[in-house]
């Protein structure tokens, strides 16, 4: 992440609607995450973290079926774009330059498929897209910046195009899971997640940026954690909990909406 953007997020985090008490985490320095960190976890193909990423991206990819030209906003190291490039004309944008350098090195068969900039600074010649994805992005942004980013992204969406967004449900058991993962892992998600949404808040957010037919569902409950007993076992659990169980107990929200004509 560039210094300017890091300062912007830090300033908005300090000035935004947070309490400012000692319980509020300090701004997170995203430059400390090694390039390709999450992509390498995905590629590992074993364990809870890898299964989490596989199931997460598979569901997003399903939602994008039938949409040819796709932009992944906050693409990080390019994992989803790499998945989509088999069936879509896929692009990624992220403000963290080292992650984009990794993405261009690993996934860009025909550069430039990835852009190191804010979504509003994308080249005009890219035009509009049939669909947008934003996977676990907005929880990392102060609310005002999240709103601006989504509005700028929707500007890049053609009329009738689709936005697919995921973010943790802080009304679910996610906060507990987050604290446990923070204690056991290398990355502190509690410090990173400064925009803590619920289904009702996410619906309002998506409608406010000009989307219609807004839906918020939930997914990812026990299945990723079942990967410690085997990859195929986790897939079986995923199929069993799909639908009612996930939508009641899922840790991650899947928000979708269509841009008005």
Which stretches of residues belong to each language-model region?
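Conserved N-terminal segment of class I S-adenosyl-L-methionine
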Residues: 2-127, 131-133, 147-150, 218, ...
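A short hydrophobic/small-residue beta-strand
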Residues: 90, 163-164
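Short catalytic micro-motifs in class I SAM-dependent methyltransferases
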Residues: 136-140
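A short glycine-rich, Lys/Arg-flanked "PGG" loop and its adjoining helix->strand segment in the class I
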Residues: 147-159
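Conserved class I S-adenosyl-L-methionine
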Residues: 164-184
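A C-terminal cap/extension of S-adenosyl-L-methionine-dependent methyltransferases
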Residues: 178-182, 204, 214-261
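Acceptor-substrate binding/catalytic loop of class I
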Residues: 185-201
């Amino acid at each position: 992440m560039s210094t300017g953007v890091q300062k912007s997020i830090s300033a908005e985090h300090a000035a935004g609607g947070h309490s400012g008490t000692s319980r509020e985490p300090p701004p997170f320095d995203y430059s400390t995450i090694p390039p390709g960190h999450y992509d390498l976890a995905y590629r590992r193909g074993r364990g809870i973290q890898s299964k989490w990423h596989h199931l997460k991206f598979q569901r997003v990819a399903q939602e994008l079926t039938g949409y040819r030209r796709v932009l992944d906003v906050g693409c990080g190291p390019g994992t989803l774009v790499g998945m989509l490039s088999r069936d879509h004309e896929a692009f990624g944008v992220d403000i963290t330059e080292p992650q984009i350098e990794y993405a261009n090195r690993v996934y860009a068969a025909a550069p430039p498929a990835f852009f190191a900039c804010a979504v509003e600074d994308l080249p005009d010649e890219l035009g509009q897209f049939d669909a947008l994805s934003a996977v676990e992005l907005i929880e990392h942004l102060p609310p005002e910046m999240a709103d601006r980013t989504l509005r700028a992204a929707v500007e890049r969406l053609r009329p009738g195009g689709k936005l697919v967004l995921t973010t943790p449900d802080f009304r679910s058991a996610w906060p507990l899971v987050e604290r446990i993962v923070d204690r056991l892992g290398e990355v502190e998600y509690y410090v990173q997640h400064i925009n803590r949404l619920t289904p009702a808040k996410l619906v309002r957010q998506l409608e406010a940026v000009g989307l219609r037919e807004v839906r918020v569902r939930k997914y990812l409950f026990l299945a990723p954690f079942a990967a410690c007993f085997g990859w195929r076992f986790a897939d079986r659990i995923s199929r069993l909990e799909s639908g009612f169980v996930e939508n009641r107990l899922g840790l991650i929200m899947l928000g979708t909406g269509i841009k008005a004509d």
